[in-house]
Amino acid sequence: MSFASTLYKTVFKRNSVFVGTVFASAFVFQAAFDTGVTSWYENHNKGKLWKDIKGGIMNGGEEDEEDDE
């Protein structure tokens, strides 16, 4: 039995199985793509994101600032 025949019998023969396969594949692809893009974005913008600068801002900011008197 060829691969195409097996694929047809398991996925494409019944519309309900085909639609379920499409939805499941889209869900898995979306999760993997989102994780990959988020990881790339956070690495590309390291030091500029809120989670990176939050501690400095919440603790009063930088110590190098001088008051104008």
UniProtKB/Swiss-Prot annotation:
Keywords: Electron transport, Membrane, Mitochondrion, Mitochondrion inner membrane, Respiratory chain, Transmembrane, Transmembrane helix, Transport. GO terms for biological process: mitochondrial electron transport, ubiquinol to cytochrome c. One of its GO terms (cellular component) is respiratory chain complex III. Residues 1-18 are mitochondrial matrix. Residues 45-69 are mitochondrial intermembrane. SUPFAM superfamilies: Subunit X (non-heme 7 kDa protein) of cytochrome bc1 complex (Ubiquinol-cytochrome c reductase). It is a single-pass membrane protein. InterPro entries: QCR9, QCR9_sf. Its main location: mitochondrion. The chain crosses the membrane at residues 19-44. Belongs to the UQCR10/QCR9 family. This is Cytochrome b-c1 complex subunit 9. The gene is QCR9.
